[in-house]
């Protein structure tokens, strides 16, 4: 599949040896190989390197000038030369800035047709043109530029008699290591090394290093990696690349699919209002990637062994904010290719692009964590029975789903207490929500609130029903158990805080019941200020913060940053829920953000328009949340802030399609994350 690449490299070597007057035996073998395999030069099933149809014929012309006796099939040769003429005509007629750059990049194929003085505007500080040894060598032959020569000497000093397709590639290759470690879920084992690479990359970013900013792939990867690790980087370079390289035909001549995918991922990371132009660019790139998927446009990358279709499909179907950590890691492991050969003018590869040891470690770690997670799920199922929750047939007692949301986000083996707190409280909120939303009487709702307020009560006499008795007893045991675990880590009692979290949730649920009963129509502000609490993420996330490691003082949990994180996360969940549940709640006579928005506009807008507006609102909330989570100088520890973002990802995944609790797709994901170990071919 790389025969065209091999033909090109072989002929280049023959020309060099002939010029130096060396290796006659090797020249003869090379010529024989070219003659035997020349048909591949026009074989459309072969992978075509960038500029091959111009560069390879130019080398054949040069071979003829040197009187090298090549006995080539005349039909194939004519076909090849016709392709060159058509490609040159296409580029000349196009006349775009992208095409001008492309023609400069493949300058070694243009020879004397080039205005080399104009091409030199692309020369970089290191003396190269496009960090390409071959283009730079062609420029030196034409102009005898000393900076070009110094660059070529530096490449030869580093690599000896053979140089790579791209040099230097240091920043990109190091970032590939970091990206691989993060995407495979094993970055926690290399935190010191990763920090060193990120600090050095940030230093280069601040200095405007050409190795970053003159290469779209490196710039996209550097921006995404630095921003997601809390470094203050502007999106301006990404916008510039999108305008210059993807403006007219989405993907220019200089950009391979790896670059397109990298820039697409970078364009998702919008944090600030002034970056909203990236939205349109991101949408255009998404459309392009979808078209390439449907037309099998990634066939070259797939032929190289890389499962690019799966990578692109994952990026499109699951935005970075709508996929749980463990779910993403498994997909990345399964799609990982240790070969990962790249194609520009020639093929090139690096162990930093695909590493067998990284893959082995990631599989071992994933499966080891799975064993722990399965045991914890069994423990949770025992806990359900011990607390008689299985007797409440009305409840969506989906222990596996509730545990899945914990294990898929807080996966490290040592964070078992945080996972169990998350899962148990998630199950309790599900059952309490059903009591308030579906099956409970007003008397039962008020009774449950009163029991939590009084706390020390005789459940045999104070509970108005069997199900309230079971719910309160299980809730009390859960709060006490989580409080005891947290006390060991925090060195102070936080039980009263967990009780307050639950009471806030119960009171907000009760207010919604009363609004529906009394047919009261709140303002949008009144609704949202209550609804983000009643969405009931507080009891799941907030107690778990005490169990992920860092000390959380009372001053921290009373700080505005803590409350902003909670409000933004919960508002995202509420808005996503209201979009998904609009028709059902409308039929039940219940108000939500969708129906209120339509009412506030005089009932003159359609639900489709309302959905767009609520989604836009949700986007702003999500971006504000991510900005807070990534903020380096903050009151709340990063490990705690991450939980707010993880839960935001959970709700975006669950409400992305149909009711997540009953989705067949989600059942399969639960099995992949918890039950099915990864088996490599």
Curated annotation (Swiss-Prot):
Q: Which domain of life is it from?
A: Eukaryota
* Record EC number: 4.2.3.-
Q: What biological processes does GO assign it?
A: gibberellin biosynthetic process; miltiradiene biosynthetic process; terpenoid biosynthetic process
On cofactor binding, the record's note says: Binds 3 Mg(2+) ions per subunit.
Q: Does the keyword field hold Lyase? A: yes
Q: What is its main location?
A: plastid
Q: Which GO terms describe its molecular function?
A: magnesium ion binding; terpene synthase activity
- Where found, per UniProt? Plastid, Chloroplast
- Residues that hold Mg(2+) 1 according to the record: 433, 437
Q: Which residues cross the membrane?
A: none
Residue sites binding Mg(2+) 3 per the record: 577, 585
- Cofactor requirements of the protein: Mg(2+)
Gene Ontology CC terms, in alphabetical order: chloroplast
Task: Give residue numbers for sequence motif DDXXD motif.
Answer: 433-437
So where does Mg(2+) 2 get bound? Answer: 433, 437
Look up the record and name the pathway of this protein. Answer: Secondary metabolite biosynthesis; terpenoid biosynthesis
Query: What UniProt keywords are attached to this protein's entry?
Result: Chloroplast, Lyase, Magnesium, Metal-binding, Plastid
Domain remarks: The Asp-Asp-Xaa-Xaa-Asp/Glu (DDXXD/E) motif is important for the catalytic activity, presumably through binding to Mg(2+).
Matching PANTHER family? ENT-COPALYL DIPHOSPHATE SYNTHASE, CHLOROPLASTIC (PTHR31739), ENT-KAUR-16-ENE SYNTHASE, CHLOROPLASTIC (PTHR31739:SF3)
What does the record give as the function of this protein?
May be involved in the biosynthesis of ent-kaurene diterpenoids natural products such as oridonin, miltiradiene, eriocalyxin B and nezukol, known to exhibit antitumor, anti-inflammatory and antibacterial activities.
What family classification does the UniProt entry report for this protein?
Belongs to the terpene synthase family.
What this protein is called in its record is Terpene synthase 6, chloroplastic
Native source species: Isodon rubescens (Rabdosia rubescens)
């Amino acid at each position: 599949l790389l025969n065209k690449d091999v033909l090109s490299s072989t002929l280049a070597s023959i020309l060099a040896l002939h010029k130096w007057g060396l290796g006659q035996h090797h020249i003869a073998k090379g010529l024989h190989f070219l003659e035997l395999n020349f048909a591949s030069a026009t074989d459309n099933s072969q992978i075509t390197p960038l500029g091959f149809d111009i560069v390879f014929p130019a080398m054949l012309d040069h071979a003829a000038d040197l009187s090298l006796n090549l006995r080539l099939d005349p039909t194939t040769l004519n076909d090849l030369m016709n392709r060159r003429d058509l490609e040159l005509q296409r580029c000349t007629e196009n006349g775009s800035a992208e095409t001008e750059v492309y023609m400069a990049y493949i300058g070694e194929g243009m020879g004397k047709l080039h205005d080399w003085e104009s091409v030199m505007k692309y020369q970089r500080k290191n003396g190269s043109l496009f960090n390409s040894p071959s283009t730079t060598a062609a420029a030196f032959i034409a102009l005898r530029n000393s900076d070009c020569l110094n660059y070529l000497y530096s490449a030869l000093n580093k690599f000896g008699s053979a140089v790579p397709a791209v040099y230097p590639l240091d920043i990109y290759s190091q970032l590939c290591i970091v990206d691989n470690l993060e995407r495979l879920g094993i970055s926690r084992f290399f935190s010191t090394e990763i920090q060193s690479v990120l600090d050095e990359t940030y230093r280069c970013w601040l200095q405007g290093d050409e190795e970053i900013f003159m290469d779209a792939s490196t710039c996209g990867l550097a921006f995404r990696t630095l921003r997601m690790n809390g470094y203050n980087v502007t999106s301006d370079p990404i916008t510039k690349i999108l305008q210059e390289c993807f403006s007219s035909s989405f993907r220019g001549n200089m950009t391979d699919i790896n670059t397109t995918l990298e820039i697409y991922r970078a364009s998702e990371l919008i944090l600030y209002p002034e970056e909203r132009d990236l939205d349109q660019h991101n949408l255009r790139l998404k459309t392009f990637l979808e078209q390439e998927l449907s037309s099998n446009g990634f066939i070259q990358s797939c032929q190289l062994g890389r499962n690019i279709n799966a990578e692109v499909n994952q990026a499109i179907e699951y935005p970075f904010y709508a996929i749980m950590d463990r779910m993403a890691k498994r997909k990345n492991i399964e799609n990982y290719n240790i070969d990962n050969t790249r194609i520009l003018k020639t093929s090139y590869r690096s162990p930093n692009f695909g590493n067998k040891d990284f893959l082995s470690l990631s599989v071992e770690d994933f499966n080891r964590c799975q064993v722990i997670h399965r045991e914890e799920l069994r423990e949770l199922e025992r806990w359900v029975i011990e607390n008689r929750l299985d007797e409440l047939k009305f409840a969506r007692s989906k222990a596996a789903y509730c545990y899945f949301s914990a294990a898929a986000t807080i996966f490290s083996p040592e964070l078992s207490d945080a996972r169990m707190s998350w899962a148990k409280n998630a199950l309790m909120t599900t059952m309490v929500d059903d009591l308030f939303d579906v099956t409970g009487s007003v008397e039962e709702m008020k009774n449950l609130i009163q029991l939590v307020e009084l706390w020390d009560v005789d459940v045999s006499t104070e509970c108005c029903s069997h199900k309230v008795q079971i719910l309160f007893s299980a809730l009390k045991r859960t709060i006490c158990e989580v409080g005891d675990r947290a006390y060991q880590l925090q060195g102070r009692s936080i039980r009263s805080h967990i009780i307050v979290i639950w009471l806030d949730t119960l009171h907000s649920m009760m207010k919604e019941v009363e609004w529906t009963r009394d047919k009261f129509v709140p303002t949008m502000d009144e609704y949202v200020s209550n609804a983000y609490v009643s969405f009931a993420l507080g009891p799941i996330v907030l107690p778990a913060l005490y169990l992920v490691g860092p000390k959380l003082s009372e001053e921290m949990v009373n700080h505005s940053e803590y409350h902003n994180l909670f409000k933004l996360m919960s508002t995202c969940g509420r808005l996503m829920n209201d979009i998904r549940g609009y028709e059902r709640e409308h039929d039940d006579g219940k108000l939500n953000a969708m129906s209120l928005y339509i009412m506030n506009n005089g009932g003159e807008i359609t639900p489709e328009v309302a959905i767009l507006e609520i989604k836009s609102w949700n986007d702003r909330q999500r971006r504000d949340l991510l900005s807070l989570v990534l903020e380096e100088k903050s009151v709340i520890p990063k490990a705690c802030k991450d939980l707010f973002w993880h839960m935001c990802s959970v709700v975006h995944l669950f409400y992305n399609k149909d009711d997540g609790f009953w989705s067949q797709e989600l059942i399969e994901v639960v099995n992949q994350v918890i039950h099915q170990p990864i088996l490599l071919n």
